[in-house]
Design a protein with these regions (language model features):
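N-terminal secretory/membrane targeting signals
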Residues: 1-29
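Transmembrane alpha-helix boundary signature
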Residues: 25-31, 60-64, 82-105, 114-131, ...
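Interfacial loop-to-helix junctions that mark the boundaries of transmembrane helices
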Residues: 32-44, 65-74, 95-107, 209-218, ...
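Hydrophobic mid-bilayer segments of alpha-helices in multi-pass membrane transport proteins
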Residues: 43-55, 69-86, 106-115, 260-270, ...
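Membrane-interfacial helix-loop connectors
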Residues: 84-86, 147, 158-172, 176-178, ...
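Juxtamembrane and boundary regions of transmembrane helices in multi-pass small-molecule transporters
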Residues: 172, 191-192, 210-259, 432-485
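Core mid-bundle transmembrane helix pairs that form the ion/substrate translocation pathway
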Residues: 212-326, 482
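Transmembrane helical segments that form the transport core of multi-pass membrane transport proteins
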Residues: 270-405
Length: 485
């Protein structure tokens, strides 16, 4: 199954490369490329919108077809962007744009997800513990606390199977996984650069490592409100389940819990260390050339795989391999481990990363012209765009914008002085509002896919957004009133 999947991905990439190579080459200078990026027509964003519409609608109207032909839909929309882009700006720029997106962003993204998926799949829990409202609140609080220190993806992959297993007997449980995404996969990652990639990028641009702890009061407010709402929802659902005869098959609720495969925590720490190194090594002289550029393997044009990224990839893949080699396959069987979830995410996100390039180009070119000068504006605009685009470049665009406004006090970054309130707003917008959609942050879709595989009926793409509008947006309005006005 994995071999077939890899062949399909390589076929998709090969098709794009062959097209770009076969188009009459119109080599653009770096300056011209930047100018062209600023003039990208809005129509080139249509493939991105089309792919999102497929992700949202086809599982509802043609579920069987969608399951079999996701890779073809991704290839169609990707080529629908690449071909016109190559015709308009030359195959050289098209190939460079696609490679930069795949090597610079997608590769490390999917390798990190793959590593965490493998390691967490080798940790299992068994014992007499049933998912009651109090236990579920405790699990969500534990996962949220871990998110800032092992990353939202790490915490999500570590906690998702135990939460599902404890609530296997429940009939009404989709709300549990939705709040799991809200809290563990997003909001919990706001207290350190390890927590979420935008904060890691901020650290690489001069934001102090522990500065993110300034976000603690904001995070505590969000977590407290959402856990209170969750407890109320879960208690109602729990009582209905019990009234309908649903009961956990355990003799001593809340006791005798056993965790299998605990040695895999070593490999989890190894992956976290790889992520930290990817943020620290580029700033070291040993990894820079005379011009201060990060050293790496040049692939095409200005595209290169940096040595820090290569070290990160090797460390993560080694951790995944060691995890499989040292763990009994019986543990994976207990976890109902399959490759389906990671395959789905890998296929869909390769298309998302490629087709969202025009939107990111327009944002980078026009971001400073939006007239956004107040913290509350930064919070909402950064958050709204992070809900659908990659939150890391979105964060960097608005951090750059804030640094160019000429402030003389605040946090000293390599992009300029950024007032504390402005930086808090940008950080919270990028991290918190990744929870607004399934594609807003890396773990969201993984949690959905694993939940679906385990028989939990998760809401559709638009159905999930409705949950966000009802439960998250009011909390974000409260954030604005309390912290950003």
């Amino acid at each position: 199954m994995m071999k077939t999947f890899v062949k399909k991905i390589l076929l998709l990439l090969g098709s794009a490369a062959v097209f770009c190579a076969g188009t009459p080459l119109q080599v653009l200078a770096a300056e011209a490329g930047g100018e062209a990026a600023g003039m990208v027509p809005l129509a080139l964003c249509i493939p991105f919108a089309g792919l999102l519409l497929c992700i949202a609608a086809l599982p509802l109207v043609r579920a069987e077809w969608w399951e079999k032909h996701q890779i073809h839909a991704v290839a169609f929309w990707s080529l629908l962007f690449i071909i016109p882009f190559a015709v308009m700006y030359g195959s050289g720029m098209a190939l460079e744009t696609v490679l930069e997106c795949l090597v610079g962003d997608y590769l490390t993204f999917i390798v990190l997800l793959f590593g965490l998926f493998c390691v967490s799949g080798n940790i299992a829990m068994e014992g007499d513990l049933a998912g009651s409202p109090r236990i579920n609140v405790g699990l969500l609080l534990l996962g949220t606390s871990l998110s800032s220190w092992i990353g939202t993806t790490g915490a999500s992959m570590l906690m998702v199977r135990p939460v599902i297993k404890m609530n296997y007997w429940r009939r009404r449980k989709s709300h549990i996984m939705i709040f799991f995404i809200f809290l563990i996969s997003n909001i919990g990652g706001s207290l350190s650069p390890i927590g979420d990639p935008p904060l890691l990028m901020g650290f690489m641009r001069g934001v102090p490592f522990f500065w993110s702890l300034h976000l603690l009061p904001i995070m505590v407010l969000n977590v407290a409100v959402l856990l209170f709402v969750f407890y109320w929802l879960d208690r109602r659902a729990y009582r209905k389940d019990i009234a309908e005869g649903c009961k956990p098959d355990i003799s001593k609720p809340g006791t005798e819990v056993k965790i299998l495969g605990l040695h895999n925590l070593i490999f989890l720490v190894m992956i976290v260390a790889a992520v930290i190194l990817s943020g620290v090594l580029p700033g070291m002289a040993a990894f820079q050339d005379e011009a201060g550029q990060v050293l790496g393997i040049r692939l095409y044009g200005e595209v290169k795989l940096s040595y820090p990224a290569l070290i990160e990839i090797v460390m993560i893949l080694l951790a995944a391999w060691l995890s499989f080699k040292t763990t009994n396959s019986e543990i994976r069987r207990k976890n109902h481990f399959t490759w389906g979830a990671i395959e789905e995410v890998a296929v869909l996100f390769i298309g998302i990363f490629i087709t969202m390039q025009p939107a990111l180009m327009i944002l980078k070119a026009k971001g400073a012209q939006l007239g956004i000068t107040e913290p509350y504006q930064m919070f909402w605009v950064t958050g709204a765009l992070s809900s659908f685009l990659d939150n890391t470049p979105t964060y960097l665009v608005f951090l750059t914008t804030a640094g160019s406004l000429g402030f003389t006090s605040g946090i000293a970054t390599t992009l300029g002085q950024v007032p504390v309130a402005m930086l808090e707003a940008i950080s919270c917008g990028a991290v918190f509002m990744g929870a607004n959609t399934y594609i807003g942050n890396a773990p969201n879709f993984m949690v959905k896919s694993i939940s679906d595989e385990n028989g939990i009926r998760m809401p559709s793409f638009f159905g999930y957004i409705l949950w966000s509008l009802i439960f998250l947006v009011p909390v974000f309005l409260l954030d604005m009133l309390v912290f950003f006005l």
